[in-house]
């Protein structure tokens, strides 16, 4: 079996000479087998290893015994041991997620922490061939694309490694028995409360008995074949993503040209955009991809809500994917501005300079959209900065009647999601300047103007 593990390691370039490896160890057969084998291979690869164990505080005394077992196992082999105790159920309740998901987040965060403390460059996880088969089967049942069928990667992110990924669970259990390792058995793995356990305990044994004795091998081979095809499509999609997508802090704009691509590529472009925004593709299903594609075929202004607090909207054929913002405060924030000083509005990351111009030669009417001039007497003393409110109206320069601010934004082709971010300079409560775009007819300089007001708006650096 050790030779099979070495073959997996070398085939996937998992371990190089002088690597420092954190081994994730629960105390069960898989992780104890992995730790023991990597200990035996220390001299071959000239590696340093440590063990990281998380006590989830779910199974009471049994969890404490798991921790004690792993600690003593490490002491016996003189392996450095790191442990974290955390109430996973409490964290799950606070974050409103399942205990299973909370446990995974906590474990992987701890592995990363130990990686830094141990100055490691690899983290070894004990997934095996049966885990791979169960994962693929579970995703097929739930509904997945090729990305899900490819299963668990032998190497992820260049440093998460799975040396047992091609080893059957039966071989692992035999190794533990032959080496007299006496691993801990997690009783919850025998409960049928989780779908994965039902697949392991009921479905796969049923398929083995009635359809295919080597279903584990068949599912693993399926994963390998799909990985080859999927990796090629991902490579194409990556180049198309760079060509058609523009990333901002909380937004990705997918240009309309992207939607002429084949659906196999387009769906991957969309998934990449989602991953950029929320660092996860969890909960993103085919129906959501289809909704985004449908939104692009609709008229400008069409928008849809998506999982993970995202929204997509059509902006003249381009699709803007963004994180939804709290709109409850839109139009309610208002900031008083003062004459002859730089007004810093730190909350909005803005600096607004206001001063009286005494010499008309100082006026620069052309070339800077962030500096505008107004009749100071018309402006009055009450100057504020705010954002749009429902029912706002504005009289654009050169016109004699008010227009709805909403209609002005539409005519300017300002995306719906950007409209809430445009600062408005107001005099006595009336909009005088849609910053970056238009000034009001009501406060313009004319032949009767005696005092000129200069307002300059900038972003804080």
UniProtKB/Swiss-Prot annotation:
Name of the protein in question: tRNA(Ile)-lysidine synthase
UniProt feature coiled coil, ranges: none
GO (cellular component) term, any one: cytoplasm
Protein family (similarity comment): Belongs to the tRNA(Ile)-lysidine synthase family.
Any one Gene Ontology molecular-function term assigned to this protein's record: tRNA(Ile)-lysidine synthase activity
Main location per the UniProt record: cytoplasm
Function: Ligates lysine onto the cytidine present at position 34 of the AUA codon-specific tRNA(Ile) that contains the anticodon CAU, in an ATP-dependent manner. Cytidine is converted to lysidine, thus changing the amino acid specificity of the tRNA from methionine to isoleucine.
Organism: Clostridium acetobutylicum (strain ATCC 824 / DSM 792 / JCM 1419 / IAM 19013 / LMG 5710 / NBRC 13948 / NRRL B-527 / VKM B-1787 / 2291 / W)
Residues that hold ATP according to the record: 26-31
